[in-house]
Amino acid sequence: MSAVTGLVRSEIHGGDVAVLTLDRPRANAINPALVADLRRAVADAAGAPALLLASSQGLFSAGWDLPTVRTFGREEMSRFLADFTALMRELFSFDGPVVAALPGHAIAGGLILASGADERIAAEGKGEFGLSEVALGVPIPRAAYEIFRYILGDRGAERLAAAGDNVSAVRALEMGFLDRIVPGEDLLDVAVGRARQLAGRSRAAYAEIKRRARAGTLARFDRASDGDPFLDFWFSEEARGRIDQLVARLTKKA
């Protein structure tokens, strides 16, 4: 069974793995429509034994659609941030296994999106992984930071977010963000196989272990938006200047 929800293709692979494929040219840049479609697809897959996040392109996601979100006023940006944060919680708290197949770059919001998976499998090659928000004059949102603390620990999350460097797949594996690197032609098969393997565990036991392991992180995640200065940074003079410069470069390349 397959379905297309706007910018996300949904397919039940082999009867047990719900494959959600990001399909937004170009670069799967994250805008409100993609967030809404992905949230809808995740909700529709709630009963699936396992969930797989994939991409129709040679990369996973280049992050937020800056030329679009740059035009948002504070209220619209606040809604977008709230919806993106809700998506991250829905992925991170999904009670079945969630695997992400990363064919290439996962940058900024794209890396945050991938962090919602239980395991991340990347293709060999020149893909880069990083949190580049600091280069734009903004920190990553507090709620998202809690997920990186869960994956990398306090020091690892700080180094990734504060340095703003993009790293190779090999380095991301060494850091503990990636779980496996495979040849690109094998990526989808390996990721589906891993999701199916995890789905073969007791669903109730797997869900209980996830709840125990993530309870503290989710509690901090739910408190994180209160007093988060992200929007103050986003609308600061420094950030606006940096974002405008990047958007100008992106527009010129297009």
Predicted regions and their residues:
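Glycine-rich beta-to-alpha transition loops that act as phosphate-gripper elements at the mouths
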Residues: A101-I107, A161-D165
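Well-ordered beta-strand positions
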Residues: E119, R159, A163-D165, R171, ...
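Terminal low-complexity tails and localization/encapsulation signals of metabolic enzymes
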Residues: S2, R242-A254
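Glycine- (often His-adjacent) and acidic-residue-rich active-site loop
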Residues: S55-R89
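CoA-thioester-processing core
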Residues: I107-L160, V190-R194
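Conserved CoA-thioester-binding segment of acyl-CoA-metabolizing enzymes
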Residues: M1-S56, E75, R89
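C-terminal long alpha-helix characteristic of the crotonase
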Residues: A122-G127, L178-A224, L250-A254
